[in-house]
Amino acid sequence: MLKVIENCCDKSYLDMLKYAAQESNGWNLTYPLGYSFEDKHLKLTLIENEPVNELIAGMAMGLLIQIYNSKTESGVPASDFFYPEVLYCGISVKDKNRLDNPHTDHENDTGIIKILGLLNSNWNKKDGGAFIHGDETVHLKPTNFVIFDPRIIHHADKITTHEKRLGIDFTVKRKNNV
């Protein structure tokens, strides 16, 4: 399952969230779990069952509600796919100096889906970093988010610009009808 939610927020909201994340001192090199230090990327954990960074977690929840109230490219309400109850939310940094690792998440948990989008309001297709999910590729546009099954191999394609790409991801409970 891979669904694109289009134009679900304002670019200025993404800019505000990106700025707050950039100014945070809570960044870590925990992920991906089990990998060597050289293969890890920066991650800012906002919610891990409860808020870790209350200010930015609140901003992220505001974004999630905007996504929840939006529709897919085919007109299906995003609210048909998930409950807006966050199990995890984080912001990651990717750049052209590190290839992303193809991986799966929550392999044994069928009740989970993930939502991913970019905080870079100026990101273009030419900048690279498309989202690859199984055999599907989505060029992430600012204000668009993807809802996807994390048990399918996924990763970011090569980034071609010098700019760092900030992505926000939510782990939420899947609705039974999905």
Residue ranges and their predicted role:
Residues 1-79:
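Non-heme Fe(II)/2-oxoglutarate
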Residues 69-178:
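Catalytic core of non-heme Fe(II) oxygenases with the double-stranded beta-helix
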